[in-house]
Design a protein with these regions (language model features):
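Extreme N-terminal starter segment of soluble prokaryotic enzymes
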Residues: 1-5
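Glycine-rich adenosine-cofactor-binding loop
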Residues: 6-16, 21, 143-164
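Residues in the short beta-alpha loop(s) of Rossmann-like NAD(P)-binding domains
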Residues: 11, 34, 93-95, 175-176
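NAD(P)-binding Rossmann-fold cofactor-contacting core
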Residues: 24-38, 166-186
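Short loop/helix-cap segments at secondary-structure boundaries that form the rim of catalytic
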Residues: 36-38, 99-104, 179-186, 200, ...
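Glycine/serine-rich phosphate-binding loop and adjoining beta1-alpha1 elements at the start
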Residues: 54-144
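Conserved mixed alpha/beta catalytic, RNA-binding, or beta-rich assembly cores of soluble enzyme
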Residues: 56, 112-115, 136, 157, ...
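Rossmann-like adenosine-cofactor binding region
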Residues: 58-61, 73-86, 183-230
Length: 230
C-alpha cells in the first residue's frame, strides 16, 4: 500500500489540513480543491491510489461528494466502487455511511468528527458565522439587542459567551435543568425550550441551534415582524 495521503474535496478546512500534513513532511495529494489552491493537485485516478483517503465534512451533500471548491461533480455511488478494502478512509459525519460501506463494498470508514475536541473546534467558526449573518441581516447593532439562543449545545454555549461580550441582552433556552442553572450562572436569562410560548415576541434576534423543529408556525407568529431568525 502506498503511503500517500489523498485529500478529496471539502472546503478550506481540508485545504488547511492538506497544507499542514505537507508541512509535517508527509506525501500528500489533493483533488477537488482547486478553487482553494489545494496543494499538489492530482487526477482523481492518482488520488484514489493513496493508502489513506481523507474525505470532507460532511462527506456527502445531496448524494454527491461534498465539493464546494470545484465545478466538478462526483456522485458518491460512483466513488465507493473505486476505493479499496485495504485503504484507510476518514470522513466527517459518517453515521449513515459507515455501516453500508462495510456491507456493500467492504470499506472501513472512520469518522474524525466523532471526536469531541473536533466538534468543539468546528463550533467556533459556526458560531462566528452566525454572528456575521446576524449583523448582515439587521440594521441594528448586536449591542443592546434582545437575543435568544435556542439550545445549549456546543454552538449555543459559544454564542452564550459571544453575545453578552458584545453587549447583547441574551436569553438561552435549554431542556435540562442543569443547563438552565449554568445559563443563569453565566449571567444569561434561562428559558425552558418546551415553554417558549409567550416569550418570543420580545426578541430582536433568535439563534436556533437545535437540529429539529422548535419554531413551528404558531411560534413564528409570536415573533416581531422585524425579528431576524437564524
Amino acid at each position: 500500500m502506498k503511503r500517500t495521503i489523498a485529500v478529496l474535496g471539502g472546503d478550506m478546512r481540508q485545504v488547511c489540513l492538506a497544507r499542514l500534513l505537507l508541512e509535517d513532511g508527509l506525501d500528500v495529494v489533493s483533488w477537488g480543491l482547486e478553487q482553494g489552491d489545494g496543494p499538489n493537485p492530482a487526477p482523481l485516478n492518482q488520488a484514489l491510489e493513496a493508502g489513506l483517503v481523507l474525505l470532507p465534512l460532511p462527506v456527502c451533500r445531496a448524494g454527491n461528494l461534498n465539493l464546494p471548491l470545484t465545478d466538478t461533480e462526483l456522485g458518491a455511488e460512483q466513488l465507493w466502487p473505486r476505493l479499496r478494502y485495504d485503504q484507510l478512509l476518514l470522513g466527517g459525519m459518517t453515521e449513515e455511511l459507515s455501516g453500508r460501506l462495510m456491507t456493500d463494498f467492504g470499506l472501513t470508514l472512520l469518522d474524525y468528527y466523532d471526536r469531541e475536541e473536533t466538534q468543539i473546534a468546528n463550533a467556533v467558526p459556526t458560531a462566528e458565522g452566525a454572528l456575521q449573518l446576524a449583523m448582515e441581516a439587521t440594521d441594528r447593532t448586536i449591542h443592546a439587542s434582545r437575543c435568544l439562543i435556542i439550545g445549549y449545545g456546543r454552538i449555543g454555549k459559544l454564542l452564550a459567551r459571544m453575545l453578552p461580550a458584545l453587549g447583547a441582552r441574551t436569553a438561552v433556552s435549554a431542556r435540562r435543568y442543569s443547563d438552565l442553572a449554568w445559563i443563569e450562572a453565566t449571567g444569561c436569562r434561562g428559558l425552558r425550550t418546551a415553554a417558549l410560548a409567550g416569550e418570543l415576541g420580545e426578541f430582536d434576534l433568535i439563534f436556533n441551534t437545535v437540529p429539529s423543529l422548535v419554531l413551528d408556525a404558531s411560534r413564528l407568529r409570536e415573533t416581531k415582524a422585524d425579528c431576524v431568525i437564524l
